[in-house]
């Protein structure tokens, strides 16, 4: 559990794709949001009940099945709004009466504790992160020493390049990165560690980044991801 001045966070490891979902709550009011409800919710619901937490919101980083496949189940239990970037809402096409479409840099409140949505397209058109205090829930935009795929429907490596640049330029180096999947040797990192060890931060040329993301990366790296110092430090493929 990560704790800061006004907000507490509990991480749950769920599903066959190593998802990490996050329960965030205001320490004073116990108002909570669940980020990317998917797979097995029983441990989450038990934790909420046992700690007298009041779940009031669902926050989505994007609309891929492995991040939303328990939204309907949760809404049967809790009549609460679902927050998603407005571009992603259109891309997804799912209709909820209580769907709230977010602009980038729009604030969300749990009690008096503030979270901010950050539009980070690339993995999907409306992918977003959620920042609060010194933390960034990064969904499938940024993994520890990796980034989200851009070869699925709606993916765009040019947009991913811009999104990573925006994170690098607009967040403090000690920001804690909380990814949507546990694909690395570490569960979390700081932005400073990502800038120094994530190969996707080492590009200043868009064309080279696109080539690496779309063609070279999956041939030269394997999970769990470890830090790489410079683009040259990648595994050479073995040929028969």
Name each region found by the language model.
Residues 34-35, 56-64, 82-86, 119-122, ...:
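Active-site neighborhood of phospho(di)ester-bond hydrolases with catalytic His/Asp-centered motifs
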Residues 90-94, 145-152:
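A short acidic, helix-capping loop that chelates divalent metal ions and anchors anionic groups
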Residues 18, 32, 39-116, 197-200:
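Active-site HxH/HxHxD metal-binding segment of metal-dependent hydrolases
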Residues 65, 69, 126, 143-144, ...:
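Short active-site segment of divalent metal-dependent hydrolases/proteases
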Residues 1-4, 162-235, 240:
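Accessory terminal helices/loops
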Residues 47-48, 53, 149-158:
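A short alpha/beta connector and helix-capping loop motif
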Residues 1-53, 129-139:
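Conserved beta-strand hairpin/beta-sheet module of binuclear metal-dependent hydrolase folds
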Residues 22-23, 105-132:
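Core dinuclear metal-dependent hydrolase active-site scaffold
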């Amino acid at each position: 559990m990560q704790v800061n001045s006004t907000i507490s966070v509990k991480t749950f490891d769920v599903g066959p794709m190593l998802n990490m979902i996050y329960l965030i709550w205001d320490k004073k009011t116990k108002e909570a949001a669940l980020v990317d409800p998917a797979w097995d919710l029983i441990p989450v619901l038990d934790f909420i009940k046992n700690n007298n937490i009041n779940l009031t919101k669902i926050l989505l980083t994007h609309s891929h099945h492995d991040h939303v496949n328990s939204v309907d189940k949760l809404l049967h239990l809790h009549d609460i709004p679902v927050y998603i970037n407005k571009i992603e809402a259109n891309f997804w096409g799912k209709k909820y009466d209580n769907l709230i479409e977010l602009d980038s840099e729009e604030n969300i409140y749990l009690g008096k504790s503030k979270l901010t949505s950050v539009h980070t397209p690339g993995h999907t058109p409306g992918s977003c992160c959620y920042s609060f205090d010194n933390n960034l829930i990064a969904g499938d935009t940024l993994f520890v020493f990796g980034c989200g795929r851009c070869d699925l429907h709606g993916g765009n490596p040019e947009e991913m390049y811009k999104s990573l640049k925006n994170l690098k330029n607009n967040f403090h180096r000690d920001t804690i990165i909380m990814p949507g999947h546990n694909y690395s040797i570490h569960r979390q990192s700081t932005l400073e560690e990502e800038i120094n060890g994530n190969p996707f931060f080492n590009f200043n040329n868009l064309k080279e980044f696109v080539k690496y993301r779309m063609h070279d990366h999956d041939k030269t790296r394997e999970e769990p991801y470890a830090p790489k110092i410079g683009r040259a430090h990648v595994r050479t493929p073995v040929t028969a």
